[in-house]
Amino acid sequence: MALEDRCSPQSAPSPITLQMQHLHHQQQQQQQQQQQMQHLHQLQQLQQLHQQQLAAGVFHHPAMAFDAAAAAAAAAAAAAAHAHAAALQQRLSGSGSPASCSTPASSTPLTIKEEESDSVIGDMSFHNQTHTTNEEEEAEEDDDIDVDVDDTSAGGRLPPPAHQQQSTAKPSLAFSISNILSDRFGDVQKPGKSMENQASIFRPFEASRSQTATPSAFTRVDLLEFSRQQQAAAAAATAAMMLERANFLNCFNPAAYPRIHEEIVQSRLRRSAANAVIPPPMSSKMSDANPEKSALGSLCKAVSQIGQPAAPTMTQPPLSSSASSLASPPPASNASTISSTSSVATSSSSSSSGCSSAASSLNSSPSSRLGASGSGVNASSPQPQPIPPPSAVSRDSGMESSDDTRSETGSTTTEGGKNEMWPAWVYCTRYSDRPSSGPRYRRPKQPKDKTNDEKRPRTAFSSEQLARLKREFNENRYLTERRRQQLSSELGLNEAQIKIWFQNKRAKIKKSTGSKNPLALQLMAQGLYNHTTVPLTKEEEELEMRMNGQIP
């Protein structure tokens, strides 16, 4: 049984199979020998070509001639090629034994080959050019999918040489010695050959260093040209913006918007007259500083007052060099108040040569306006006249409309055309920053119909309660919530009654002593705080008069 199993036809190797294996093994050995012979032949050709190129000086540096580094690299490459050729010859001589070619992997060496030029192997055009590298050619033979898709043109391909057409085995990927040893990667580009296909993949090792354009120096002429272009672009943008603004202002026809049209016309007339009188440097400065603010501000003010009754417009007197005054109150320092004050100027001001300096300083502070006007027309009277006391201005100025303020501020200027300081309430944001709030009138209080039964009776504190409240007030004038609750529970009073008693006590002491908040004193001196519940002392009157300019 054991003999049958040992000699069974399934387990015994057939002589045909042994012959086939032997033939296959011989074919593999022959293919490997042919491949190694081809490599040796290629190395010999490359060595000869490299020696010819070294003699002709082909491998030149892009920036300079053939230097010592390139020569050393080429010599090392040639020596390596000689050593590799000798090693291949020894390997071929010993490859006849069956042990040397037992496996295909051990018999296929990783060759390091030199770079070829177009004259030897010109079958592939790398990146649509006629030069190629030997490593790409080897890689294309090794991998079927690694096909250069850029080489689709028929003229770009040449038939491969004979020693490559008969090679059926695929050698391993090889690296170029000259690529590794030289300072540039890739084949030598032909001079004067530009990249034909710009849409393909950019491979930086193709571009030669000599073809890279050196950046030109950024000269002063270029800088001036660049700044001139920037200025021209800015001027064009400014002109477009001014044109758009002019179109916006011109869209208000006098039939539909008579008051807005009148405001725009008045502002343009005043600005043109001021520009005609001001000398050229001042006019250019004013045109830069105040281009369209007055017109746009008067437009906003007029739009906010469309529903209000129109004020009687004052006819402009003829232009004279002796007497005129800028009757509009000066705007505050912030730009938001320009919209209201410039509209006041358009209806009650008359432009002339005498007020040109004041009109040009419309957006300045009162002190700068005084300096400008005093240096011009008012040179004869350098000291401005003091403003009237706050009593001359209405006590209830908060109830006035914007039209009333125009007439009142116009009356503060004297007939000599001397520009005065405006009262402090003009600068208050309540009246100059919100022109759309309209006229303010005091509403009369309606009498209440409450009878004596509905009125809450006056709290009558007992002597003990009063004594306890006074003692607490002397300790602390302001009660905390917890202390107020304790007093309410102890005295049998409401918390509101205790709170009101403390408030009244503080008010009586404040009224009797006459001490005031310094902020209230300053506002009273400027006419902004007219709640004179306590008569002013001599010091306060003196302070107020000094603030108003009545006392030097």
From Swiss-Prot:
One GO CC annotation: nucleus
Comp. bias intervals (Low complexity): 93-108, 317-382
Location in or out of the cell: Nucleus
Bias type Basic and acidic residues, positions: 446-457
Chain residue ranges for the region called Disordered: 93-112, 130-171, 309-419, 433-460
SUPFAM superfamilies in UniProt: Homeodomain-like
A Pfam entry, by short name: Homeodomain
Principal place of residence: nucleus
One MF annotation (Gene Ontology) recorded for this entry: DNA-binding transcription factor activity, RNA polymerase II-specific
InterPro entries (UniProt xref): Engrailed_Homeobox_TFs, HD, HD_engrailed, HD_metazoa, Homeobox-engrailed_C-terminal, Homeobox-engrailed_CS, Homeobox_CS, Homeodomain-like_sf
Acidic residues bias: start-end ranges: 135-151
DNA bind region: 454-513
Keyword vocabulary terms for this entry: Developmental protein, DNA-binding, Homeobox, Nucleus, Phosphoprotein, Repressor, Segmentation polarity protein, Transcription, Transcription regulation
Entry's family note: Belongs to the engrailed homeobox family.
Function: This protein specifies the body segmentation pattern. It is required for the development of the central nervous system. Transcriptional regulator that represses activated promoters. Wg signaling operates by inactivating the SGG repression of EN autoactivation.
Protein name: Segmentation polarity homeobox protein engrailed
Naturally occurring in which organism (per UniProt): Drosophila melanogaster
